[in-house]
């Protein structure tokens, strides 16, 4: 057993097929890219963890359980790699606050950032989402994220603004649980003369 691990931390999902195709695919890529490290999994949603345990007898650690397991296994280096899109409540309270309690218990325990932090991160995401599909001006392309009550939810507004600045006027960003919500996006789309709407997820996985 190696003394170096990468702990891939996701919100989690109770949909088994979906989990394998999304979180599982990310974990597989990380595992293949860093062969000197053992890849391990943790979820931040205790509700998802409980459902999987009760329904499927599938045990998945939360962050604290994963770190306790690493300590028991004699691990010295733990790289925390979140799959979260932004530094919202899950990232701060479920990951950073938990990891802070273990700073002195490992030789090295760095925390990677979520997807959207720097302007370059936004540029990369825009390049990715606008390169998928060939949509004309008659088509509104709507991306929906989960959303968050945290201040970091502003990433969606920033992303919308940068898309407009780059001339992607038919691209719209909304959220399921925050702002801009369904009604906000619908109002924006109605301002255009579109014949077709394409709805896409801006999230890693369904919950």
Regions found by a protein language model. Name each.
Residues 1-207:
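Active-site-proximal alpha-helix that buttresses catalytic centers in soluble enzyme cores
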């Amino acid at each position: 057993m190696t003394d170096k691990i990468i702990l891939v931390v996701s919100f989690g999902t109770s949909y088994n097929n979906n989990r394998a195709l999304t979180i599982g695919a990310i974990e597989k890529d990380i595992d293949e890219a860093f062969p000197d490290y053992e890849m391990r999994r943790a979820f931040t949603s205790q509700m998802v963890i409980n459902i999987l345990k009760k329904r499927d007898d599938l045990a998945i650690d939360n962050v604290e359980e994963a770190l306790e397991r690493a300590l028991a296994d004699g691990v010295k280096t733990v790289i925390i790699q979140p799959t979260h899109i932004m530094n919202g409540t899950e990232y701060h309270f479920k990951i950073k606050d938990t990891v802070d309690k273990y700073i002195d218990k490992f030789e090295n325990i760095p925390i990677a950032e979520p997807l959207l932090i720097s302007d370059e991160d936004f540029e990369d995401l825009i390049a990715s989402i606008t390169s998928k599909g060939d949509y004309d001006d008659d088509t509104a392309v709507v991306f929906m994220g989960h959303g968050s009550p945290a201040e970091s939810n502003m990433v969606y507004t920033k992303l919308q603004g940068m898309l407009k600045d780059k001339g992607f006027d038919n691209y719209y960003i909304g959220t399921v649980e925050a702002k801009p919500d369904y009604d906000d996006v619908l109002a924006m789309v109605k301002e255009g003369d579109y014949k077709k709407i394409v709805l896409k997820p801006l999230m890693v996985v369904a919950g």
